[in-house]
């Protein structure tokens, strides 16, 4: 799935991302809620206003979960097993939303790290985020 080059690219940019988990995660969610308002339906109990503590906390969880996948690039399925079960069985998140989130996350990284998000790194991150999405939707089948 991910080549050695892809893995190196993902790990390299992740060192810039992980220290901003809450900020980038919240920004990603806010962007997703704005651009794709239907995604708000999964968060009826959240204060979705800009700067919301709930959005910041959940954004941090999302980025940290992606970080867990980065730390286990050769076994993302094992690393994200509980999240896969949660999203498929309990939360019943429409799988398309993972693609929307990934797209918004790439935009956030492009805003904050334009020089680091080279075409090669962008392609590697896209493959990585697709792989994470596949893992999270595996329990839907």
Curated annotation (Swiss-Prot):
Keyword Heme: yes
Tissue-wise expression: Red blood cells.
Globin domain location: 1-141
Membrane-spanning parts: none
Amino acids binding O2: 58
PROSITE patterns, per the entry: GLOBIN (PS01033)
Gene Ontology cellular component terms for the protein in this record: blood microparticle; haptoglobin-hemoglobin complex; hemoglobin complex
Binding site for heme b: 87
Signal peptide stretch: none
Key word Transport present: yes
SUPFAM superfamilies assigned to the protein according to its UniProt record, in alphabetical order: Globin-like
GO biological process, one term: hydrogen peroxide catabolic process
Domain of life assignment: Eukaryota
One MF term in the entry's GO annotations: peroxidase activity
Pfam family membership, one: Globin
Keyword terms: Heme, Iron, Metal-binding, Oxygen transport, Transport
Purpose of the protein: Involved in oxygen transport from the lung to the various peripheral tissues.
Family stated for the protein in its record: Belongs to the globin family.
Subunit structure: There are three forms of hemoglobin in Sphenodon: A, A' and D. Hb A is a tetramer of two alpha-A and two beta-1, Hb A' is a tetramer of two alpha-a and two beta-2, Hb D is a tetramer of two alpha-D and two beta-2.
Further remark: Sphenodon Hbs have properties not found in other reptiles: poor cooperativity, high affinity for oxygen, small Bohr and haldane effects, appreciable phosphate effects (those properties are also found in the Hbs of primitive urodele and caecilian amphibians).
Protein's UniProt name: Hemoglobin subunit alpha-A
Species, as recorded: Sphenodon punctatus
Gene name as annotated: HBAA
